[in-house]
């Protein structure tokens, strides 16, 4: 029985649960449930604090886990990424009061508040900067105003929270984070149940990044159309009743869907349809 950790709440939880559901795994019906057994797929899911997931996986108690890259790195647990999942993207940066030009070197001998002390200490050591790192469990932005810290290191999304507290981010990004599937370093990658779950999740993540495009194309324009929609290996081309036309099907990156459709229409293609895909394999 495969044992998999899933975030029990927060920004990562909803997306992780959605991906697993799309991959064909059982969902919990009550948010208070701490575990869900999926006997059909031989998997048991455990709903844990995102910050603790890498620790459980790294200890070998659980086989796989979904958490944030920043949380996994900060845990110090012996885990490695198996898949990047494409949701919950954020950056982890230093921030300090606005009104002056800050450099990372200015943090020398300063107090830095953060919920990710190991990540910050690792970066400071790499830079040769000595500073006091103060661990807080949340709301680190207010720590400067309350006189607890001189600067902070935190997850930055839109930057709205920083602006509300008159803070400005500076320096290089410490970590570009997103939801990731992690496993213990040295895990057995020949395990069938493990590889099946990875393949299913990978198929859902891939499907979220692509659209299936179908269109009719004059035969004399096919070569030009294929240049616009090369697909992964090659597009599917099928004959139509009208011998002067063919039907073409190809995967296109979701972010380019509309521009590709515009180019095909300008070329002379007809009946251009874009369809969502839910999952795929062997890509």
Swiss-Prot record:
Catalysed reactions, as listed in the record: 1-(5-phospho-beta-D-ribosyl)-ATP + diphosphate = 5-phospho-alpha-D-ribose 1-diphosphate + ATP
Subcellular compartments: Cytoplasm
Enzyme class, first EC level, given as a word: transferase
Regions that span the bilayer: none
Record has Cytoplasm as a keyword: yes
Pathway listed: Amino-acid biosynthesis; L-histidine biosynthesis; L-histidine from 5-phospho-alpha-D-ribose 1-diphosphate: step 1/9
EC numbers: 2.4.2.17
Alphabetical UniProt keywords: Amino-acid biosynthesis, ATP-binding, Cytoplasm, Glycosyltransferase, Histidine biosynthesis, Magnesium, Metal-binding, Nucleotide-binding, Transferase
BP terms from Gene Ontology: L-histidine biosynthetic process
Alphabetized PANTHER family for the sequence: ATP PHOSPHORIBOSYLTRANSFERASE, ATP PHOSPHORIBOSYLTRANSFERASE ATP-PRTASE
Protein family membership: Belongs to the ATP phosphoribosyltransferase family. Long subfamily.
Name of the protein described by the UniProt record: ATP phosphoribosyltransferase
Gene: hisG
């Amino acid at each position: 029985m495969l044992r998999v950790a899933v975030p029990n709440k927060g920004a990562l939880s909803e997306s992780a649960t959605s991906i697993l559901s799309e991959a064909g795994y059982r969902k919990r019906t009550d948010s208070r449930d701490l575990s869900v057994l999926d006997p059909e797929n031989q998997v048991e899911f455990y709903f844990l604090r995102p910050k603790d997931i890498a620790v459980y996986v790294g200890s070998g108690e659980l086989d796989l886990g979904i958490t944030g890259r920043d949380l996994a790195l900060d845990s110090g647990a012996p885990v490695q990424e198996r898949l990047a999942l494409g949701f919950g993207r954020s950056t982890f940066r230093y921030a300090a009061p606005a009104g002056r030009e800050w450099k990372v070197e200015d943090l020398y001998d300063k107090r830095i508040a953060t919920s990710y002390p190991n990540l910050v200490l690792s970066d400071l050591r790499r830079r040769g900067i000595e500073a006091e790192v103060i661990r807080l469990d949340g709301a680190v932005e207010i720590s400067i105003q309350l006189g607890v810290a001189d600067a902070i290191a935190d997850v930055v999304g839109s930057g709205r929270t920083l602006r509300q507290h008159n803070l400005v981010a500076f320096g290089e990004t410490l970590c570009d984070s997103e939801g990731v599937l992690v496993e213990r370093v040295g895990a057995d990658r020949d395990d069938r149940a493990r590889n099946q779950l990875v393949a299913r999740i990978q198929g859902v993540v891939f499907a979220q990044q692509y659209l299936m495009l179908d269109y009719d194309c004059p035969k004399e324009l096919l070569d030009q159309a294929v240049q616009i929609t090369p697909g992964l290996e090659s597009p599917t081309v099928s004959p139509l009743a009208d011998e002067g036309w063919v039907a073409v099907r190809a995967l296109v990156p979701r972010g380019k869907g509309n521009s590709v459709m515009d180019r095909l229409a300008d070329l002379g293609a007809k009946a251009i349809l874009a369809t969502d895909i839910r999952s795929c394999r062997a890509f």
